[in-house]
Amino acid sequence: MAPIDPDPPDFGVSGGSGSRFSRFQLPCGSAGPSGVTVPEPEGSAAAHFNPKIILVTGGCGFIGSNFVRHVVENHPGVHVTVLDKLTYAGRRENIAGLPSDRVELVVGDICDAGLLDELVPECDAVVHCAAETHNDSSIADPEPFLHTNVEGTFRLLEAVRKHGVRCRHVSTDEVYGDLALDDPARFTEESPYRPSSPYSSTKASSDMLVRAWTRTYGLRTTISNCSNNYGPYQHVEKFIPRQITNIIDGVRPKLYGDGRNVRGWIHVDDHSSAMWEILTRGRCGETYLIGADGERSNIDVLRAILVAMGKGADDFDRVPDRPGHDRRYAIDASKLRRELGWRPTHTDFSEGLRSTIDWNLTHEPWWRPAKAATEARYAGRGR
């Protein structure tokens, strides 16, 4: 099978010059959807859903591309169409090497209603990963977050409603706000929404749109809210890869504030497997929280990275904290485990961290082009 070329000039591109999108048409199986399932009655156990053609929005981003790889590697009968705008965080290289008879890349904007009208009816389900996700960037310039996260979700829901296609909406635990460091509570599916940043407020808005369209129009949707991800193909602006690549460059890592902020960490492979279980076995209209019980403070994670890379545990610099920096996230994923039997497999955080360090050490050509510009943005914000 021929792989996807990271820079595919020879692919057939539909639309002439001035076309609103570029479609890299790779050989694939059937051209149309493989069938539409009947919505489950509210509250009933879900029948097994077997999609043959999936549209993954944001499929060249971190979470989206890892999910695409998971599908290709574990579900051989499924064809994936990736829709991605290829912003700074979405790159062709993230899906390079995947079989061209299984994966098709369409370059375009999630807010393009006409494009969605072409793509959505061709698939059995949409897995909606497209989002702007970096908190610091949302504080500096919220507008792209409103455009992609809110308007983009609205446009997608309208296409899903028009064409009767199932939607798997991917979201974050940040919509719930934060918990006190000494609070033993964890977020559940019933926790109230209290977003505290421009980013999390746009994701909360997108979740609410999904719920409203589901109730009003009877859409077949599921929502998942996941804890912090780490693993391969994560942009260097994010906490773990930023620290790793700074150490590789001989630069002292930077820690916001007192570093006691707690996050629940999950390997992106485990997130991908949970996303698939919810897509194929989750009950329509339901929300599922995804987490791996990996709560750790930022300072503990940074020290673990430093020690694993042969540095002193305190070989870092403190920088001013981010405005409104949430203190603690913690997820109770018992519903997902109880109803769908899902369990994380990357339960040794030290081992997962080591593999992530090794990946960045061996993939410098992947992250190097974005490093200087990323650090320049951080420096401009005093961080």
PLM regions with names:
Residues 92-95, 117, 179-183, 234-237, ...:
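Short aromatic-enriched loop/helix-cap "lid" or pocket-rim segments at secondary-structure transitions
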Residues 156, 210, 243, 336-337:
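Structural element of the ATP-grasp superfamily
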Residues 31, 38, 44-47, 54-55, ...:
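C-terminal substrate-binding subdomain of Rossmann-fold SDR/epimerase-dehydratase oxidoreductases
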Residues 62, 197, 231, 238, ...:
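Amphipathic alpha-helical recognition patches that constitute DNA-binding helices
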Residues 2-229, 359-365, 369, 373-383:
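N-terminal Rossmann-like NAD(P)+-binding domain of SDR-like oxidoreductases, especially those catalyzing
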Residues 205, 209, 213, 243, ...:
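Hydrophobic alpha-helix immediately C-terminal to the catalytic Tyr-X-X-X-Lys motif of short-chain
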Residues 114-117, 136, 143, 154, ...:
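Residues in well-ordered alpha-helical elements
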